[in-house]
Amino acid sequence: LLTSASFRNSLMVTLIFVVIVVAGSMILGLIAAVLCNKAIPGIRFFSTSYALPMAIASSSAAMIFKIILNPTIGILNKVTGLGINWIADPKYALVCVAVLTAWLNSGINFLYFSAGLANIDDSIYERASVDGASGVQQFFSLTLPGLSPIMFYTLVVNIIGAFQSFGQVKLLTQGGPGESTNLIVYSIYRDAFFNYR
């Protein structure tokens, strides 16, 4: 198994995919949760709409992304004027699938981080402000340590979820172009149902 070039490629592609998905979805979820933790008018509407990706099936989201990334009628190429075939280009295909997966996972991460932020006592921020700590210092010295149990849990759940990503790859790229998006789970599927191994 380890001598197979296809398997080694699939393993490398999967590891890159997992890193992009986990980092992207956790950062997006954390930023949204920190922003929604402030008392800003209309924040409830934003938080509700941000959590909506959880309710979208990965197959539906993949089809929406396929339309957005279409080289001729896709909105991304219309807005940027780049004319790139995002899904058919090996340089961009894995990133496109990873961005879709990170976006889908960011909604649940947002809820986890929001719950964690609600458990951090506001008085420690007030004391830190009185002591002269800036917002950035408060974030790194108070918020992140306060969220560390939630962050560990979210990290583990996101890693497991990223390794299980199948629908997006099947609908967007089918492991291609070449084997640029051939994740391990898709490789297993292809070997089991098409190569009969």
Locate each region found by the language model.
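A structural signal for multi-pass alpha-helical bundles of membrane permease subunits
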Residues: L1-R197
